[in-house]
Structure formats: structure tokens, C-alpha cells
């Protein structure tokens, strides 16, 4: 009897709860308006005018990851972050902004063809598009394989590049690479050449860490001894030739050396581990180490071809924390310095102010330079974790200096 009463009580309680809940739902839903909810779209809202691009400077193209591009037009935001500028699918970094002009850093992604366009926060549509191009600031050159290594490099008057090549650790000789990148054998040699340079007679001169300077008179002509330094401890690792055919050479020695075409040798006391030498405007420039400090000096050359007193140009170690390995001049006197720094090329102006060339773009240690045709500066590079050693061609937008 007790169980029956308990069941009846629970049954009635459940029916009461269901009835109460049903009435509550009916009240709630019955009180709602069954009409359409109001739209959140504001038909009276006005958007900003769409941006318009009229011109871009530099016109047509820029260096990827290097140049700041100026965009002129209308309806830009004066807040840099509200202007979204696209080079193809890559956004550029807006550095400065006004209502009619933007200054934008080009992204580091070379593309031969792209559409340049932009949007402004608050405007409904993109701007018009302009065809544009992002050129590479450097390219790998010469099809140097992973098992090959390059030491000395030089160029001839036709813009061909010559390189001392080793393969699987064994010297092969000198190869010639045309401006178009086609390789061919120039001469064979069982030795790697630390540095090579053409003279005004089209002879190729070379040094290879001994006390002699060698000469090749043309394709297929093996290197022959041209001159020997009297000091038996001398080791020559860098060489250059001036317009008179005078050869300058140096290394980790107590002297600098000049050799005339009659093979007479002059020595100039200067103790340093010299990594490279270069000529410009009647001066001999020297990159070397003294007491583990990397420096650049210059020596005046008088009318008799003799060196004057050394003058310090720049302390590379203190200013950049790196070591200078290579020197080369533009025709207007800018000095390119190849180093082992994170940004491996330093550009020194005639007033002796310096700056890293193309920061965050050039990837490898630079060991040697040689000017090609036009604005092409070739560099022999060391291997890194991500890049094998080889040759790169840097777009400098300057003509190279020729000694003759």
C-alpha cells in the first residue's frame, strides 16, 4: 500500500512539473515578437574613398629587400598602418604616409612580374593595379656545384669571369664563365690559386701562397714563374696590376711588394697579415690584420711608383666586429669590403663613412671580388649552414673601377 501511494505521489509531482514548464515556455515564446529581427547593416554608413595609385618611384622596378618605393596618388591614410600595400601577394612595410604619398619598403621576394595594389582601412575596394617588378639584389652565378670550391677570381675586358676551381678537394685549374653563365676550361693547374688578376697586356697573373708571382699568356697556357721575391719566407696570397703593368702583391709578411715588367722587385716594410689589396686614384689600399685587429689602410703611390706612408682608413673590427677579406672600388670611389660579418659587404664612401650593403639580404662570407660588365660585382663566397660556397653576382647600380 505504501509503494502504491509513493508511486502516485511521484506521478502527480512529475505531471505538475511538466505542466508548469509548459506554461512557462508558452508565456516566454508567446511574449516574443514573431516579426523579422532588425538588420545590423547601417544603410547610412559612408565608407572612405577608394585609394588611387598614380605613379611609383623607382619606375617599373626596385631591388627586393633593398629599396624603399614611393607611391604617389590619392585617398591614402595618414596613418602608416592603415595602408596595406601589396607587391603581388607580399605586403610591403609602410615607412611613411600622407594623404597623397607613401614610402614603402619592398619585400625581399624577387618577382619578374607582379601587380602592385593597395587597400586603405575603411575603404571598400582595392586601388587600381600597376605592373611592377622586384629584381634580385644578388643571384648565384656560374653553376658551382656542392663538391666544388672557388678561390681567386678575375674578369677580363669583355666581362668574362675567371675562377680558380677545386673539385672534391683537388685543384682543377682556371675556368672561364661568360656573362650569360656558360662555363668552359681556360687552363689546367694542379694548384689552387689564392688570387688572380689580368694585366694591361691581357696576361693573367696569379699567386698561390709561395714567394713567386706566376703568369699565363692566354687560354691553354699554363702558369709560368714571372718573378720571385728574394725573401724565402714570403708567402703571397693577393695580387693586383696597375695601368703601367706594375704588379703589386702581398700576404702574411713583413713587406708589401711591387714587381716591374722587367721583373725587378721592390719591398716596402709593412708587417701585417694582408688579406687583399686594391688600387684607386694613385693609392694602394690594403686590408689586413695587425694584432688580430682587421684594418684598412692606404699608401700613396708617387710618380716613380714608390709607396709613401700608410694612412688608416677604417678599423673594421671595432666598427663592424668582423674581418675584411676583399676590396674593390666603384668608378666613383666607393670601396666595397667583403667580410665575415652577418651582413658581409661594407660600403665605404669617399668621405670614409661606412654602412653595410643590403642589410639582411646577402647571405655569405665574401672572400674575393671582381667587377663584371655594367654594375655586376662578382663575389667568391664561403659556405654556411644553408649555402654552399660559390659565386654570387651583386647588383650594385654602380660601374666598377678598372685599373687600366
Where in this protein do the model-derived segments appear?
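Beta-rich, blade/repeat-based domains predominating
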Residues: 146-159, 189-203, 208, 230-253, ...
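C-terminal motif of bacterial Sec signal peptides marking the signal peptidase cleavage site
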Residues: 27-31
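Beta-strand/beta-sandwich contexts
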Residues: 33-78, 112, 123-144
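Short loop/turn segments immediately following the C-termini of beta-strands
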Residues: 121, 165-168, 208-211, 244, ...
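Short loop/turn segments that connect beta-strands within beta-propeller blades
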Residues: 135-136, 177-182, 216-221, 259-263, ...
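A short loop-to-beta-strand structural motif that recurs across blades of beta-propeller domains
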Residues: 172-176, 211-215, 255-258, 295-297, ...
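Blade-level signature of beta-propeller repeat domains, shared across WD40, Kelch, NHL, RCC1
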Residues: 364-404
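A short beta-strand motif characteristic of beta-propeller blades
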Residues: 136-145, 181-188, 221-230, 262-269, ...
